[in-house]
UniProtKB/Swiss-Prot annotation:
InterPro entries: AB_hydrolase_fold (IPR029058), AB_hydrolase_lip/est (IPR051299), Fungal_lipase-type (IPR002921). Changing residue 101 to V/S: Decreases feruloyl esterase activity. The gene is faeA. This is Feruloyl esterase A. Optimum pH is 5.0. Keywords: Carbohydrate metabolism, Disulfide bond, Glycoprotein, Hydrolase, Polysaccharide degradation, Secreted, Serine esterase, Signal, Xylan degradation. It catalyses: feruloyl-polysaccharide + H2O = ferulate + polysaccharide.
Length: 281
């Protein structure tokens, strides 16, 4: 599988014309470490949260047998946050959700005007909505000064996006970190997320959409089927580092999506050197 180096990325962006103005190379070490921490949790979700950071307390499991949606409620008393994480695709049942591209009204969030979301992931969301909202409410009531963080990889990333959208209608302090996220909804949904999560600037955003090299999943479902991405994109190229992370705030096809990757490839399963469920970090 072809890997994209930082040098190659710079050459590519240098030829991207106007898109280059909306892409900058390098992020702070603090932000980079934060992205790696959330990626660790998201990748560990494939293996029952193996090797998660020592400060994190594992809480209640989220699960629905019909959709095979898996997740957990976690807590970190050091960073003062309640974390909801969703596992990515782990079964044929999940794959059926992945391939249901029918855009569906986001009826559980009427504030999201004209919003339509990925049909399969919406089925996944409504299958666990009651569990998620109940468990988050319990934790938020017990720890009212804690931030709410939602994260996940692949299918788990889109589940995280729908969950964060729903929680943002009730709570003010919701943050979203996704890794290899498919397009989760239409332009109205992307616009709602951008407004709700202050995506107008990397300095204010609370929606960190992390991509890697030529990961093919962010190119799905196709934009010409009515789908769009939200969030500020943080594009990691190899060798991964804070300096080799690009901040992409313009056209969504300028960074990862411009590499032409399609579907599950090496760049999708591995983020910051961590492979989904491998637990070798």
């Amino acid at each position: 599988m072809k890997q994209f180096s930082a040098k190659y990325a710079l050459i590519l962006l240098a030829t991207a014309g106007q898109a280059l103005a909306a892409s900058t190379q390098g992020i702070s070490e603090d932000l980079y470490n934060r992205l790696v921490e959330m990626a660790t949790i998201s990748q560990a979700a494939y293996a029952d949260l193996c090797n998660i950071p020592s400060t994190i307390i594992k809480g209640e499991k989220i699960y629905n047998a019909q959709t095979d949606i898996n997740g957990w409620i976690l807590r970190d008393d050091t960073s003062k946050e309640i974390i909801t994480v969703f596992r990515g695709t782990g079964s044929d049942t999940n794959l059926q959700l992945d391939t249901n591209y029918t855009l569906t009204p986001f009826d559980t969030l009427p504030q999201c005007n004209d919003c339509e979301v990925h049909g399969g992931y919406y089925i996944g969301w409504i299958s666990v909505q009651d569990q998620v909202e109940s468990l988050v409410k319990q934790q938020a009531s017990q720890y009212p000064d804690y931030a709410l963080t939602v994260t996940g990889h692949s299918l788990g990333a889109s589940m995280a996006a729908l969950t964060a959208a729903q929680l943002s209608a009730t709570y003010d302090n919701v943050r979203l970190y996704t890794f290899g996220e498919p397009r989760s909804g239409n332009q109205a949904f992307a616009s709602y997320m951008n407004d709700a999560f202050q995506v107008s600037s990397p300095e204010t955003t609370q929606y960190f959409r992390v991509t890697h090299s030529n990961d093919g999943i962010p190119n799905l479902p196709p934009a010409d089927e009515g789908y769009a991405h939200g969030g500020v994109e943080y594009w990691s190229v190899d060798p991964y580092s804070a300096q080799n992370t690009f901040v992409c705030t313009g056209d969504e096809v300028q960074c990862c999506e411009a590499q032409g990757g399609q579907g599950v490839n090496d760049a999708h399963t591995t983020y910051f050197g961590m492979t989904s469920g491998a637990c070798t970090w």
